[in-house]
Amino acid sequence: MNLPELKEDFYKRYSSSDNYLHFTSNGILCTLLGHCGIENAPSLTCTLSMRVRMFARALDGNMIKIQSSAENKCFVYIFGTPPELFRGADKETVNLIRMLDNHKIKGAQILYDSTIPEFLSKKEAFSVSLIQSLMKVSSIEADALETAALSACSRPAAPYLATTATKSGYCTLLSSGIPKNYPLPLTGYKILSAHCTESERDRSGHIRTAFSSIRRMYPHISSITDITPKMFNSAKSAIKDKIALRYMYHLINETARIAAVTAALRRCDTRTLFREMNNSQKSMERFWDIGSEHLFLAHCAERLDGVAAVRFWKNGIIVIIEEDKIDHAINMIRHEFESNIGYQPTFCVSEAL
């Protein structure tokens, strides 16, 4: 559905009104380097053209109505209704709306669609879009930090902050301090993602253990970015968890890779980005306990013609590839993966926005 069709659908579903129609759009977050989902870890991210698009209009009343363009049912929240009366995704939506309880929000009519496939989470894109839409119809002003905190709804805020701080044509550095944007000139390239059914490991507990051990020796540090290689070498004997030690070693080196790439992107040098993404991939293969299906996907892609960079992402990989080589790459990866693993991976083609 294109944008005029989505707008027309809004007017078909909701009664006429003189209130202004607001538009919000947020793409799925793609991590180029670092690890946005890990507490205290730096990351370099961009948003993709797979996105949530949302139209919203103030409603004269004490309720919020939300519909998906893919469904006929309408979610209705009447102000003051206890969250305990809702279940599942509806309860999450209510908790998100109630993050704005202290901001005197107005009622609203909302229609959204999503081009994010079902096997990828749209949680960040939807949450940020909903909070931004409700603030627009209520004339509430907030900066990226506050919007991210509201959208996160008590979850780790980094992915939401990266989403709110994004800028078209740029990637976003999340480290200690305020997010920073750097040019991301990917003209002539697309971002191909390939996904398998193998689950991604939860490494957060090991990393918290390692970070706490280092902070006992260096209490002034507030993030992994602050840990120098010298500090890590001094403190690593105190990290008894050998898995945590490997993970932290990767993260310390990832910080250096991000620094090299952001310096290069100031000059619009994408070659350094591609090189360090590939170096990050090799580091993850060695230290990050990557599953066999993820490894096979990466090895299928990295030797194909036109591929500039490959890196693990979510339940699969991202591949920065020349536009005219995409179809061949998909066919080759699909055939080789199915022949060896036994099923076909799923693919998405998008652009960095």
Could you describe each region identified by the protein language model?
Residues 1-32, 42-43, 53-88, 172-310, ...:
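C-terminal nucleotide
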Residues 36-37, 126, 271, 315-318:
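Short, flexible micro-motifs
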Residues 50:
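Residues that flank catalytic or metal-binding motifs in active/ligand-binding sites
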Residues 159, 309-317:
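Conserved phosphate/anionic-ligand binding catalytic regions in large, soluble enzymes, centered on
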Residues 1-21, 29-41, 87-184, 197, ...:
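Gly/Ser-rich oxyanion-binding loop with an adjacent helix/lid
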